[in-house]
């Protein structure tokens, strides 16, 4: 009898440790009501409502629409491991993230409400390793993040012909005639460094455009992180940053089939930051099959942290027209800045385990009709106090296929800086090159 009681108690304890089966919750801004049951037939209206009622491992399916956050605050906070899947038609009969656009697009007039989160999507699980969730897999899929209408831009300075805005302004500077508040200056997706949890995170089929700070800033405690099949266009400082917040552990992460263009420097002097991807200490990175181009400083930055405490596989990527270099790393006592044709010298250096199959862009015509031509021309023409650092021959090759005027030498003075990019045109970057960069979402 005693053995049976002990066995029953053990089964009960085990049942408490097992995750409950995931529930599907549905949200439709145009057809839902917050008093509904949150089913496909009776969806909630607001995403914040679905997040509030969701339990660990639930999946929230989000129909097309621009979701403003509670009281139009412009952000959402996840304190439980919940998945967000966007790109559905209003009746959930179809899913196509490029056709049925699920958007997080905050507005400047609500920047006074931004203090509740450091990102448009802020993930912060329990801070106690004992209480934090385990064994989960969070997925963020098919959402468009655009912080361009929460930012403030100069009325005239750094405004090339045909542009909607001048250069991006960092607070407290602002365009007082057009905006109520300074730029939000926040991450698009942020996971808090104090967050704990043992599980996996996947970010896929998303678009990150006009980010006012890092696009993806992941601090992960335990588990795996995957950044797959996303478009990053016109973000500040860093597009993809994954770090380990567990001082005694390591995480594995993958960055694959992303298209990463126009990552801007920290300030408008173009002096520092402006990286597409960075690997950090206590991280093992597998970076492959991406398109990495037109970034202000470098494509891949490997200068952060002790190189003996991280590893990187950097294989089969397309690099093109990154302003200073394609890879930047520490080769003591200096910083090495290397173009793709010099990658063979880097294997075994600075934690690089593999660096094979990377190529320079051979056919610039693949971007015809996909990159905004005015934006590209202004970017290629940038010149500050120093001579341009871009290869004029490669610049003209790209100009030629886009029908832009060629330049014998690049002398045009243009002090543009993170001007707002037409967000809808960023979606054209999906499917540009078979097997490389972001493919059409499935």
Residues covered by each model-derived region:
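Right-handed parallel beta-helix
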Residues: 86, 135-149, 164-178, 198-210, ...
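Positively charged n-region of N-terminal signal peptides that target proteins for export
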Residues: 1-6
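Right-handed parallel beta-helix/beta-spiral solenoid domain characteristic of secreted/periplasmic
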Residues: 82-178
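Short glycine/acidic-rich loop motifs that flank beta-strands on beta-rich extracellular proteins
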Residues: 71-73, 94, 108-109, 114-118, ...
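Acidic, glycine- and Ser/Thr-rich low-complexity intrinsically disordered tracts
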Residues: 93-103, 107-109, 172, 179, ...
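Right-handed parallel beta-helix/beta-solenoid
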Residues: 20-49, 66
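Bacterial N-terminal signal peptides
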Residues: 8-17
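N-terminal extracellular ligand-recognition/capping segment immediately after the signal peptide
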Residues: 48, 56-94
């Amino acid at each position: 009898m005693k053995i049976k009681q002990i066995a029953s108690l053990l089964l009960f304890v085990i049942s408490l440790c097992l995750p409950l089966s995931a529930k599907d919750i549905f949200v439709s801004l145009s057809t839902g009501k917050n008093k509904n049951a949150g089913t496909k037939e009776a969806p909630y209206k607001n995403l914040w409502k679905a997040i509030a009622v969701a339990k660990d491992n639930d999946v929230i399916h989000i129909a097309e629409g621009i979701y403003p956050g509670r009281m139009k605050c412009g952000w959402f906070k996840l304190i439980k491991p919940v998945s967000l899947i966007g790109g559905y038609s209003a009746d959930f009969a179809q899913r196509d993230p490029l056709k049925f656009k699920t958007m997080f697009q905050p507005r400047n007039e609500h920047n006074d409400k931004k203090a509740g989160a450091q990102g448009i999507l802020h993930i912060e699980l329990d801070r106690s390793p004992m209480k934090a969730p385990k064994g989960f897999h969070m997925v963020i899929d098919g959402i468009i993040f655009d912080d361009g209408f929460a930012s403030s831009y100069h009325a005239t300075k750094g405004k090339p012909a045909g542009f909607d805005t001048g250069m991006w302004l960092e607070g407290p500077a602002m365009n007082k005639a057009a905006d109520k508040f300074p730029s939000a200056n926040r991450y698009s997706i942020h996971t808090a460094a104090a967050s704990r949890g043992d599980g996996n995170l996947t970010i896929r089929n998303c678009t990150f455009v006009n980010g006012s700070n890092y696009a993806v800033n992941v601090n992960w405690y335990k588990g795996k992180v995957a950044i797959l099949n996303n478009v990053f266009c016109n973000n500040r400082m860093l597009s993809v940053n994954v770090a380990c917040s567990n001082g005694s552990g390591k995480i594995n992460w993958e960055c694959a089939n992303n298209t990463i263009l126009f990552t801007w420097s920290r300030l408008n002097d173009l002096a520092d930051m402006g990286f597409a991807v960075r690997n950090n200490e206590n991280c093992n990175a597998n970076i492959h099959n991406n398109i990495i181009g037109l970034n202000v400083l470098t494509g891949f930055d490997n200068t952060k942290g002790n190189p003996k405490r991280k590893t990187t596989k950097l294989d089969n990527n397309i690099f093109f027209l990154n302003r200073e270099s394609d890879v930047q790393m520490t080769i003591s006592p200096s910083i090495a800045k290397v173009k793709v044709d010099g990658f063979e010298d880097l294997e075994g250096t600075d934690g690089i385990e593999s660096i094979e199959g990377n190529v320079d862009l051979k056919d610039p015509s693949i971007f015809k009709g996909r990159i905004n031509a005015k934006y590209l021309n202004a970017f290629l023409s940038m010149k500050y106090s120093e001579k341009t650092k871009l290869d004029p021959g490669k610049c003209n090759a790209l100009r030629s296929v886009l029908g832009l005027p060629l330049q014998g030498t690049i002398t045009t003075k243009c002090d543009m800086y993170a001007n707002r990019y037409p967000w809808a045109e960023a979606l054209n970057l999906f499917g540009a090159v078979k097997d490389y960069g972001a493919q059409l979402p499935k």
